[in-house]
Amino acid sequence: MGKNTSFVLDEHYSAFIDGEIAAGRYRSASEVIRSALRLLEDRETQLRALREALEAGERSGSSTPFDFDGFLGRKRADASRGR
């Protein structure tokens, strides 16, 4: 069951909502707000995942140098041997 909540919007957001309804993208202000909240929730979820990945990377310690030329040499050698 939904919860009735009221809030005050400034002219900018009020006009934006009215424009979305007039354009036929939404049927009501409630639909616009629900859509905006879904987007905000998705963004927060993505940011949380990014923060967790960054923290995991920091905990994994210092990186080691990568020898790209050596890597390519090994791959080419493997390819020539049919691996």
Curated annotation (Swiss-Prot):
Does the record bear Coiled coil in its keywords? yes
One annotated GO molecular function is: toxin sequestering activity
This protein's gene is called: parD1
| Keywords from the UniProt entry | Coiled coil, Toxin-antitoxin system
Family, according to the entry, reads as follows: Belongs to the ParD antitoxin family.
Region span, Disordered: 54-83
What is the native source organism of this protein?
Answer: Mycobacterium tuberculosis (strain ATCC 25618 / H37Rv)
Return the protein name. Antitoxin ParD1
What is known about what this protein does? Answer: Antitoxin component of a type II toxin-antitoxin (TA) system. Upon expression in E.coli neutralizes the effect of cognate toxin ParE1.
- Per the record, the domain of life is Bacteria
UniProt GO BP = detoxification; regulation of DNA-templated transcription
Ranges in a coiled coil: 33-60
